Amino acid sequence: MRRAALILAFVLFIGLSSATVTSADSITYNSGTSEFFDGDVFAIEVTADQSTDEIDIYLGASELSEKTDGEVNQDLSIEFTHQDSKLKYSTSTSDELRDIVTLTTYYEDGFDTEQDAIDAIKSDCYDLNQNGNGSGRYSRYYSVTSPVYDYEIYCFQKNEKLATPAYIDNPDEIFTAKAELQAGDKTIQSATLSNGDAGDGTVTDLGDSKISWNGNLDLGASEPENSRVIALYSNDFENGWRIGNKQSYEDYKTFIGGGDAYDLLIDWQDGTYTASEVEDELVNTDANQAVEEASSSTTDLVNAKVKDSSLDTGSFVYDTPELLSYPSFTVYVDAGENGYIEVTKPTGDPDIISTSSTEIKEGDEGTVTATVENVGDGEGEFSGRLSSCGEGFSIVDDQNTKNVGAGESVTYSFDVAFSSVSSESKEISGSCTFEVNGVESSDSTSVSVTGIQQSECNPGDQRREKNENDRWEIYTCQDNGLTYEYDVTCAEDEKAVAQGDNQFSCEKQDDDSGGGDNTGSDSGLFSNLFGGSGSGDLLTQVHTALSILAGLVAGFFGYRGARWIHGETDIKGGFKLESRNVSRVKRGSPVAGIVGAVLGFVVGYGVASVFHPVVQIIVVLGIAVGLYYFR
C-alpha cells in the first residue's frame, strides 16, 4: 500500500470577534510528498476573519474520501482549546535609580579643627547627592569648658532601606493553547502550544504529527500601560516585588538629591526645626510615599502577579482575556494503510504467468526470464529477484523493480552463471527460485536451468601413466567425456604401447623398444611405419603405409592437375578449350606441379589416416581401377 500524508492547512486572520472556528472552506488533494512524510497529500484550508478562543473542526471520512482515489477510514477532528494568555514584564535594575531609604538626624561636636569636622561628614553622614563627599553642615563655637573654639556637625544617617527600585520592561507575550488531533477512535495526539512553539517558521510536534507555522501566534488583547509605574523590591514585600507609582519615586529622588533634604539641615542648624521635627515629620515623608503600591487608576498592572521573586531576574505576569490571533499554519498527519489516518487504495497483486529456462555452457552465462501479470485493481510496484540457485549455478543479477499497471504484464530477465561441479554427468540440471513482491502480496516459482560441462577427453580414448611403483597404468575416457577411468596396470616386464587412435595395450618389450611417457597414440608419420615406437603391430604399419600411399597418389594427381591448370591459363586464343591438340600438362610450370604435389600429398595422407585400414584398402583399389581406365 502506498503511504500518504495528510496535510491540514489552516489560514486564520486576526479580527475583532471571538467566534469558534468549526469548518473548512476548501479541501484539495495533491499527489506527491510532504516535507515530513512520504506519500500523497491532503490540503485542508480554513479561513477565519476573527481572533478566537477556540478552534473545533470536524471532517468526515466520506468528505475526505471524495478528494482522493482511495478510501479514508476515519473521521478527523482538530481542536484548539484551553487557551491561557499572559503578558510577562521583566525588571531591570540601574545605577540611575537610588535605593529608597529613611533617614535619621545626626549631631556631633568637639572637633578640634575644621578639617576634622569635614572628614567626619564624609565618613559618618549619608551622601544626599551621591557625589562621594558626604552631605552635612558644620559650624564653629566657643567651648566654655576649655577656652578654645571647637567645631560641630549636622547631617543625616541612613536609618532603613525601604526598597530597591527597578524599571519595568516592555512585555513579552506568554500564552498556551492545547491542540488535540484525533482520527476516529484512535489515541488522541496532543500538544500544549506556547508562543515559543508557534513562531514564524517554527515546527511543533503534535504527537507523531507536525504543525508548521507561517506567522506568529499573537494575543488578541491590548497591553496594560507600564510607563507610569516602577518595580520595587524588598524582602519585606510579599513575594519580594510590588508595583509602585513612578511619579512618587521621582518625587522622592528629587527631594533627596535636589536640595530639599539639605535645606532641612540648614533649618535644623539655625533652630527653625528641632531634630525630632525634621526626622519624624519632614525628611521621610517622600520615602514612605514612594514605596506605596500604585493604585488601579494608575495602571492595570497593579493586578499583575509576581512570577520571579529574585532581585536580579524579577518579573511579573499579567493575565489577559483568553483570545488568540492565529496565523496560517499547516498540520501534517501521517496517513496510509498503516498511518494514523488510514487511507486504503487499490493495489497491485503480482502473479507469475510464465518462465523460460536456459542452457549454460561451463564458464559462461545464460539468461532466465519470468513474466508477471498485475491481477490487482491498482498499479503495483513489484520487486522481482532470484533468491537462490542450485549447486554450480550463481546469480549475476539478483533484483529488479518495475511499476506495473492493473492488468498489465512485465518480464524480468536475470543472468545466471555456471561452473562445473560434477564428473558424473555431461549435463547438470538445476533450478533457481524467482520471487516477486508487491506491497501486500507476493508470488514465487522455480525456473529450470541446465549446465553443459566441457569435455575433458573423447569417449574411448586412452592414456597411460606410471604409478608410484614405476609400472604402467592405462586409463580410458568415460562415455560422458568428463574424466579418465582406470583400466589396467601392466606387469613389471610390460610397457603400455600405443596401438593407434589413442589406444594402448600392455606388451612385453626390450629395454630399447620404445613405450616412452607419451600419453598420445604414438602414430607419427614415419615412426609407425618403421617401428620407431617399437610396437611391431602389423595392422598399425599397414594403416600408416596405406595412408602414405594415398598421399603419394594424391600428390601425383596434384602435380598433374596443377600443371594442367597452369598450362590452360597460358594458352592464347578466343576459346581456350578448342585447342585440344595442345598438352596443358607439358605447357604448365613444374613449380606449379610441385606445389600441387605437396598439397595433394598432405591432403591425401591426412584424409586417409582417419579411416580404418579396411576402408583404406577399398579406396586404394578404387583409385587404381580409376587410373587404369582414365589414365
Swiss-Prot record:
Domain IV, required for fusogenic activity: region residues: 456-509
Domain I N-terminus as annotated region, ranges: 20-90
Compartment annotation: Cell surface; Cell membrane
Residues annotated for Ca(2+) binding in this entry: 112, 146, 149-150
Bilayer topology: Multi-pass membrane protein
Residue segments, region Domain II N-terminus: 91-170
Region spans: Stem: 510-537
GO molecular function: metal ion binding
Magnesium is among the record's keywords: no
Region of interest (Domain I central section), ranges: 171-224
Signal sequence region: 1-19
Positions of region (Disordered): 443-467
Disulfide bonds: 125-155, 389-432, 457-477, 490-506
Region (Domain II C-terminus), start-end ranges: 225-316
Record keywords, A-Z: Calcium, Cell membrane, Disulfide bond, Membrane, Metal-binding, Signal, Transmembrane, Transmembrane helix
Any one biological process term the GO annotation gives: plasma membrane fusion
Function statement: Exhibits fusogenic activity. Mediates cell-cell fusion in mammalian cells when present in both cells (bilateral fusion).
HAMAP family tied to this protein: Fusexin_1 (MF_00869)
Record-given protein name: Fusexin 1
Gene symbol of the encoding locus: fsx1
